[in-house]
Amino acid sequence: QADVDPAYNFAVQVKINGAYINYLLPVKYKFTDPVKGELYQPLVVIPSMLLKSEPALRIVINKDEKIKGDLTIQNKKNNIVATPHTNYFLSNNKPDPSVKFNIGSVVMTAKDQAITVGYEIKSDTASAFRFLAKDNNMDYYSSSELKEIKYDHIPYINYMVKPEVEFKKIDVKTYNKKIGYIVGAGDKVPESLEQMGYEVTLLTEKEMAKNGLDKFEAIITGVRTYNTNDWMSKYYNKLMKYVEDG
């Protein structure tokens, strides 16, 4: 849908010529921006803890591979003692021991404080894991990640997704392992290449100026590289010479 459902609605009844008309108005948050003036944005209701899993997708080459990642727990109120979990349990309702967190529980005393917990999972256990965190003070489980879309010309859009890591098991053979990557408008190609076993060097303007390109077996440019990097035109001839040399 184009917009999210409002957290709360205000019921209004209007009487016109003896007829009653009922409609709902979304409750909005009003604030004053020092530059833009008085603004209205949708009211967002969130749980006491927010979670974020990185990476959300993991390429698995070896079926016995141990996957490492990070789970960030953010406190949205004061004084929380949180314990990380996954939704993958054994038949006795105890957490699967194949999922290991490097911290058993975290203590967060300040609002908006965030702590990152490392985890390790055997890739052959399941195809996906969903993460949860338990508020030990309230015996409450949270499994929500907040996504935000913010542009000046539309109201902010906030929505919740489940913090998960998904495993994609593929059969791949890698050759010519050294790759140079010129970052474009923001993508996750370098991370995916590294998961597949390639050695990826990010080629910034500084790197392009000082490095010869002949040490790379391939050079990849990201999405809209020439639109996002003004300096690319200076190295056009250098890149074409790399192509010419094979």
Predicted segments — roles?
Residues 110-156:
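Helix-enriched interaction subdomains in cytosolic or periplasmic regions
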Residues 1-26, 118-130:
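Eukaryote-biased detector of low-complexity, proline/serine/threonine-rich segments
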Residues 178-245:
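Helical hinge/lid and interdomain linker segments adjacent to catalytic or ligand-binding clefts
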Residues 19-55, 139-171:
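Short beta-strand elements
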